[in-house]
Amino acid sequence: MKTKHLLQALALVALGQGAVHAAPLMLQDASITATYNGAADGMLGLDHDFAAGPGANTTKLDPTDTGVEFLTSDFLFGIDFSADGLLTVIANYAVAPGAYSMRFDLGGALPVTTFTLTGMEGLTGIPSLSIIDSHTIALDLSGVDWSEFSSLSARLETGPAVAVPEPGVPAILMGGLATLALVQNGRSGRKPRA
């Protein structure tokens, strides 16, 4: 088998399996509305300087990613969202188990398909994470015992339907080699042998 035929075959194989998926930043520029223990006035948002008032439970994602987006009105918890879908809840004090629940409506962000616990530091008990609908998530922190500045992290992800396929590096290289082989074959004026 000639080299150019081998290159053509390798290029076709590489193109057939070279796609990888890149997930877009799902919370970039998101406007998030939150409730704490079922009450809108239980959450204080960054856009309102964490002060109570109408609409204080809605805030945009912090573009500097330097602080939390929400504080609970009892100042027990700070809630931080990152643009790549990581949610972190931080206890500002030692917090005994009690009835603590939070809901977050992510507004126009991409639909959430998975919400998984990724880490816990300085707390005991298991929080309950749930997806209410494609844009709303809930945390039930009842039965969780928090030490001061303990935290939990959870990852929000979108499904494969929103992933953007991109060709992998090997596929691009093999595609270029295939193009060169085809051009070379066309210039020679000969018909390829099978």
Q: PLM ranges: what are they?
A:
Residues 15, 163-165:
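Generic structural signal for beta-strand residues in well-ordered domains
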Residues 165-185:
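A short, hydrophobic C-terminal helix/tail in secreted or cell-surface proteins
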Residues 16-20, 178, 188:
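Hydrophobic alpha-helical membrane context
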Residues 17, 36, 173-176:
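N-terminal regions of proteins, emphasizing targeting and processing segments when present
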Residues 23-163:
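Mature extracellular "passenger" or substrate-interacting domains of secreted, surface-exposed proteins
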Residues 2-20:
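Gram-negative bacterial Sec-dependent N-terminal signal peptides
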Residues 1-5, 184-188:
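Short alpha-helical segments used as structural interaction elements across diverse proteins
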Residues 189-194:
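Short, charged juxtamembrane terminal tails flanking transmembrane helices
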